[in-house]
UniProtKB/Swiss-Prot annotation:
GO terms for biological process: amino acid metabolic process; ethanolamine catabolic process. Induction: Part of the 17-gene eut operon transcribed from a single promoter, induced by ethanolamine and adenosylcobalamin (AdoCbl, vitamin B12). PANTHER family: ETHANOLAMINE AMMONIA-LYASE HEAVY CHAIN, ETHANOLAMINE AMMONIA-LYASE LARGE SUBUNIT. This is Ethanolamine ammonia-lyase large subunit. Keywords: Bacterial microcompartment, Cobalamin, Cobalt, Lyase, Virulence. Disulfide bonds: none annotated. It comes from Salmonella typhimurium (strain LT2 / SGSC1412 / ATCC 700720). NCBIfam families: PRK15067.1. It is found in: Bacterial microcompartment. Disruption phenotype: No aerobic growth on ethanolamine (EA) supplemented with cobalamin (vitamin B12). No phenotype during growth in vitro. Decreased expression of eutR during bacterial growth in vitro. About 10-fold outcompeted by wild-type in mouse intestine at 2 and 4 days following oral infection, but no effect seen during growth in peritoneal exudate macrophages. A non-polar deletion mutant does not grow on EA between pH 5.5 and pH 8.5, stops acetaldehyde release on EA plus vitamin B12. A deletion allows growth on acetate, suggesting BMC assembly or maintenance is impaired.
């Protein structure tokens, strides 16, 4: 395994695979904060060159956290299909990138090949891709999942309706749900971030969400994004169950910082299969985001792109209905400006799809970042072009509870009309019965929540 290269007469020597992976990243503030970023553009190019010549086996055999020390590493490594891996283990990362992007490589070819990839390999491919490569490659890798709606079908673009309220006021939550539905939002999930994380409040909010779903016979699923153990307890006590949510991290230490163990995720999957009101096979929902491991002091000297890819390796094990990166939510300490946020969003979507998960993105930023709503609009259009499964939707894109800026209900409608995309088929049929949509386009009734009263 070669760990050095020469560029313009200068020799660049790297100590191990972890350092090569880190220094091959495009510039981002989180890697600088962690002390793992390339010192110059020249060193970055050198690292990319070295990484491109490494084999799949080189990367797999050198995970950024040792197998013996980390349950996430063990899960990712143990899930590898050895037949798929043995076919590609001697390929260089450059050859794997070319294979993914080749017109001769089919959806089924990638579906088999991805079974042989560890998360570090997935990250390695993303690091030697341009933004256009990430978009083109993502488009080639549809991932379709079924709950009560079917998400990820090529030609569709879905939306999580996010009716958050600073007091968990159920009237406010219901009003936002009606407004979102009137714009055609909500086919991914109607998902509320609660202020208060207890069983009683969770049940009250779930009852509100499912009160609307049941009253209008809406083919979708609800979720209240409390801690996974709170959701499990509420569902076991009789609360209506849709998707079960948890934020995840790419290391065992990071999971512990979130108060999560793999056994909890195993239990969530079992409870969902037994109790939840889901027609399909997929009942879990995970959120991630570059920088989360570093913020928890749980990155073990690895860069944030590689740690994010490990989130997707963990998620893949549980076959979730939804996974999304909350790309700019963690703040400018990790993704400083619109350039870094856009790059991260494209990387995350590509890595999620190459990992085989139903990948969406919360196109967002915090109020102290060097970004604005144009960032969100740029990123959502790029991601929709890349085949992203879903984005978020809330009134005017302003989350007054979580205090960050995301995409609005009308943004999903804009993307669908701009790129000739549709909601999930079950949801579109319901929108047509309500007079909100006809022939794939919103009607004059759209955007008026009074149609529900």
């Amino acid at each position: 395994m070669k760990l050095k290269t020469t560029l313009f007469g200068n020799v660049y020597q790297f100590k191990d695979v972890k350092e090569v992976l880190a220094k091959a990243n495009e510039l981002r503030s989180g890697d600088v904060l962690a002390g793992v970023a390339a010192a110059s553009s020249q060193e970055r190019v050198a690292a990319k060159q070295v990484l491109s010549e490494m084999t799949v086996a080189d990367i797999r055999n050198n995970p950024v956290i040792a197998y013996e020390e980390d349950c996430v590493t063990r899960l990712i490594q143990d899930d590898v299909n050895e037949t798929a891996y043995n076919r590609i283990k001697n390929w260089s990362i450059s050859e794997l990138r070319e294979y993914v992007l080749s017109d001769e490589t089919s959806v089924d070819d990638i579906a088999f090949t991805r079974k042989g990839l560890t998360s570090e390999v997935v990250a390695a491919v993303a690091k030697i891709c341009s933004n256009a490569d990430l978009i083109y490659g993502g488009k080639k890798m549809p991932v379709i999942k079924k709950a009560n709606t079917t998400i990820g079908i090529p030609g569709t673009f879905s939306c999580r309706l996010q009716p958050n309220d600073t007091r968990d006021d159920v009237q406010s939550i219901a009003a936002q749900i009606y407004e979102g539905l009137s714009f055609g939002a909500g086919d991914a999930v109607i998902g509320v971030n609660p202020v208060t994380d207890d069983v009683e409040n969770l049940t009250r909010v779930l009852d509100t969400v499912y009160g609307v779903i049941d009253k209008f016979n809406i083919p979708t699923q609800g979720c209240v994004l409390a801690h996974v153990t709170t959701q499990i307890e509420a569902i076991r006590r009789g609360a209506p169950g849709g998707l079960i949510f948890q934020s995840i991290c790419g290391s065992e230490k990071g999971l512990k910082e979130f108060g999560v163990e793999l056994a909890m995720l195993d239990e969530a999957r079992a409870v969902g299969a037994e109790f939840n009101r889901i027609a399909g096979e997929n009942c879990l929902y995970f959120e991630t985001g570059q920088g989360s491991a570093l913020s928890a002091g749980a990155n073990f000297g690895a860069d944030q792109v590689t740690m994010e890819a490990r989130n997707y390796g963990l998620a893949r094990h549980y076959d979730p209905f939804l996974v999304n990166t909350v790309v700019g939510f963690i703040g400018p300490e990790y993704l400083y400006n619109d350039r870094q946020i856009i790059r991260a969003g494209l990387e995350d979507h590509f890595m999620g799809k190459l990992s085989g998960i139903s990948m969406g993105c919360d196109c967002c930023y915090t109020n102290h970042a060097d970004a604005d709503q144009n960032l969100n609009e740029n990123l959502m259009i790029l991601l929709a072009t890349a085949g992203c499964n879903y984005i978020m939707g809330m009134p005017l894109g302003d989350d007054i509870m979580l205090n960050y800026q995301t995409t609005a209900f009308h943004d999903t409608a804009t993307v669908r009309q701009l790129l000739n995309l549709r909601p999930s088929p079950e949801f579109e049929r319901w929108l047509e019965t309500m007079g909100i949509m006809a022939n794939g386009r919103l009607t004059k009734r759209a955007g008026d929540p009074s149609l529900f009263f």
